[in-house]
């Protein structure tokens, strides 16, 4: 089963023919965890907030996971805390991450978690061996017989149907909530990778800080995230109509509720430090890249992840580093889909399979 250099619909068809329905691909993210399960000629997809509610006195005692736990963020009684098991793409709490993964696998298997043979989990490209083993151990504790961790960038390339087996090269820019990966792929393997431990979460926090500074109003992180989604943009030469959105917070002067208007320029200002770091990382990758690979990635670079939806981003990248990029049509799920494809074909990443894929 050759999965490399095929379009997404062709890959899905091969998964269907093999009947590999007891496998899951998981994008274990800082903000959201996405599960992809082959179903017929497509994928069943499940998006789960990466939030766990636990007892304050015993953080290993899990009370809720996912949407229910997310609703508790900032609203819990004194004896309960709602937390994110991952920070900057790295597991902060083994027990809480295990609860999240069990919940995700349960969703993906329609409550038949014991039937899962294999899961493949996408994680940041610069994860240490200790971090990789932690994810593998958690997956096995959660009930999977076989667990493989792969770079989110490589997984995204596979999920997007990029021709990763070709020698010319492709590049994926994966902009997550906690971290961002820039991955260069040739002959089915990673030739270079640069990870920055910044992402959409940092933009949200910067929005909160800027609203405090400008309006003397404290808004919650959810309001900041909504503003980013509604009017998000980055500074670029692109012609973008300025827009505004309302947010409700607490006046720092009166402690009363107060509505403020957040405009797209404020979001662009909040995003600027993260965009600058991304551009610097891209410049480093291009500096290390051979002329042969540069000619390949020039027309085969895709941007995925939630932050890719900021207007003006593709124009800004081209202005700064001279590489035209395409924003994925399905930026939030390609990592999970790619992981599901690898789960359906465990040998897909072995060198001899990569070489065979070229013939």
Label the predicted regions.
Residues 1-172, 185-301, 308-335, 340-359:
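Nucleotide/phosphate-binding catalytic cleft detector across ATP-hydrolyzing
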